[in-house]
Amino acid sequence: MTAKTLLGKAAAGVRTSRITRAVPADDGRRKGAHLLKVRDVALFADIIGQGYPLLLMHGGPSLDHWSLTPFRELADQFTVVFYDHRCNGRSVGAPVSSMTFENLTADAEALREELGFERWAVLGHSFGGHVALEYALRYPASLSHLVLLDTGGEARWSQQNAPELLARRGYSPRMVELIRRWFNGEFAPHEYVPMAMRILMAGVYSYNPSLWQIAREELQGGWHTKFRPQAFIFAGRHLLKGWSVMDRLAEITAPTLVMAGSSDFVFPPECQRELAAGTPHARLQLIDRAGHDPHSEQTAEVMAAVRHFLSAETPAA
């Protein structure tokens, strides 16, 4: 969950190639914001730019692609594919009970096929990072690069550790309990916005929260967000209960960038080190003076890191 949207190593012996090769021809049908029918859903997608394809998986759940608005600047170098997960944002056609990792990843794979890309890079933020990890494990042949932004390989970091970390940081017992309920989906849909506002105004997601920072992030696109509280509740109560891929990280074959704000309370540095250590071809980069949304707080540094990573030599299919 982002502050913005709450409010409004290569493998040895493997041939390498530049990421700029084998870019599909643009047919005009892909570009712009529209609904794309794939499988049993219509996914809202916004495709911009030209170059090697980069799929962005947003967090939440309950949010949409607007939470990743700062990444629009990468369109000068890449074809950037924003989309809303099923049951999130402006995507339509499926009940919230269908929001499983099997369906979420199959949707992304069907989207790749619909857009005509052989492979692509995938960036997942927060919950989107969970989906990206599952995608890397289920569809390795479709993935050239993996960027994991402020995420973890198991749900205990948000559902159990995050409240405990806030308590150690001196937050009130009421706020700690609110965060515990929040990440475990222990609330009704009508409570979503009031709870989100309390959490946002407490500044837990940001390194240096201020009204100016909130206003600046809203101007970047957060006010466009369409909230879907039921998705967040379903994830907390069902989808993420006991979820972990930590015992399967060694299966990930794609070069991986693990990146996060050094002050993130949801997926703190120890989580990032654990994630990077378990992933064979991963590099770790912590962003100073940033919390859960470093792409909003330290935009230039994050964009430079992603550009550098995606432009490096990479294993070929």
Residue ranges and their predicted role:
Residues F265-C271:
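Conserved alpha/beta-hydrolase "acid-adjacent" motif
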Residues I252, V258-A260:
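Short beta-strand/loop motif that positions the catalytic acidic residue
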Residues E118-A162:
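Conserved hydrolase catalytic core segment
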Residues A282-A317:
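Catalytic active-site module of serine/aspartate enzymes centered on a nucleophile-bearing elbow/loop
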Residues L146-G185:
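Flexible "cap/lid" loop of the alpha/beta hydrolase fold
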Residues F82, C87-F127, A304:
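Active-site loop/oxyanion-hole signature of alpha/beta-hydrolase fold enzymes
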Residues V41-G93:
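Conserved HGGG/HGGXW glycine-rich cap/lid loop of the alpha/beta-hydrolase fold
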Residues E177-D247, A254:
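Alpha/beta-hydrolase
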